[in-house]
UniProtKB/Swiss-Prot annotation:
Lineage: Archaea, Methanobacteriati, Methanobacteriota, Methanomada group, Methanococci
Functional description taken from the UniProt entry: Catalyzes the dephosphorylation of undecaprenyl diphosphate (UPP).
Top EC class for this record: hydrolase
Protein name (record): Undecaprenyl-diphosphatase
Keywords associated with the record: Cell membrane, Hydrolase, Membrane, Transmembrane, Transmembrane helix
Origin species: Methanococcus maripaludis (strain DSM 14266 / JCM 13030 / NBRC 101832 / S2 / LL)
């Protein structure tokens, strides 16, 4: 049952800007069990498949453009790679510290409140000056730096990248696309690196399937909420979750 619940939590919260890693740690604490970072990463592979299906048209377009040696798609792919590098560096260099944070509900609560602040600010950022193809490399790096902070439980990956993209002037629909696309290498890499740490069971595989299905639902919801200017709802939720975690866990 625990694996099933964690699968649902991972699927829904991976793309909603409320921090999937933070919620996995919270529910693990509620179950009074030790955080299984390996299983958490395994669930990331499920949401990797969900986002790959959700943005399959964009991925196919980029791959086709690269094979045809079209400059705009080569540049876009290069920017996505650049956006990924900071998170990879942080994950490899500070993996042990990050894993230890999963056991600190106080820090998770603090980080959730930071995510909440970013979400409240995001709804007021609507410059619509840039598209996914027109952002400069410097912007791609900045968005990547924001994503790097999301390795900490309680800091939302989708929340930080959406905030950064909107702050830098990207239109809302393209900000969502860019956030989803740049999540692919990070979630895939994290899942593959941690696979060696888990022993597969039928319950964990079922949790994987549930995480995949709920991930598709989460993708649809976050796209609708961002375009509709309703990110503040997630901000208020993060504050409530932060209060609960700090006071009662």
């Amino acid at each position: 049952m625990e694996e099933l619940i964690l699968g649902i939590v991972q699927g829904l919260t991976e793309f909603l800007p409320i921090s999937s890693s933070g919620h996995l740690a919270i529910f693990t604490a509620l179950f009074n069990s030790t955080p299984d970072v390996g299983y958490f990463a395994f669930l990331h592979l499920a949401t990797f498949l969900a986002v790959l299906i959700f943005v399959k048209a964009e991925v196919f377009e980029i791959i086709t453009g690269i094979t045809k040696k079209e400059t705009e798609y080569i540049n876009l792919a290069s920017k996505l790679v650049l956006s990924t590098i900071p998170a990879v560096i942080v994950g490899l260099c500070f993996g042990d510290f990050i894993e230890s944070v999963f056991s600190s509900t106080l820090l998770i609560g603090v980080f959730l409140s930071i995510t909440g602040i970013l979400m409240l600010l995001s709804d007021n950022l609507n410059k619509n000056l840039k598209t996914i193809k027109s952002i400069p490399y410097w912007d791609a790096l900045i968005i990547g730096v924001f994503q790097a902070f999301s390795v900490l439980p309680g800091i939302s990956r989708s929340g930080t990248t959406l905030f950064a993209a909107l702050f830098l002037g990207m239109n809302k629909e393209d900000a969502v696309k860019y956030s989803f696309l740049m999540s692919l290498p990070v979630t895939f890499g994290a899942g593959i690196l941690e696979l060696q740490k888990i022993t597969f069971s039928s319950e964990q595989l079922f949790g994987f399937v549930i995480s995949f299905l709920t991930g598709l639902l989460g993708l649809y919801l976050v796209k609708k909420m961002v375009i509709g200017g309703k990110l503040k709802i997630f901000g208020y939720y993060c504050f409530l979750a932060s209060f609960f975690v700090i006071m009662f866990l």
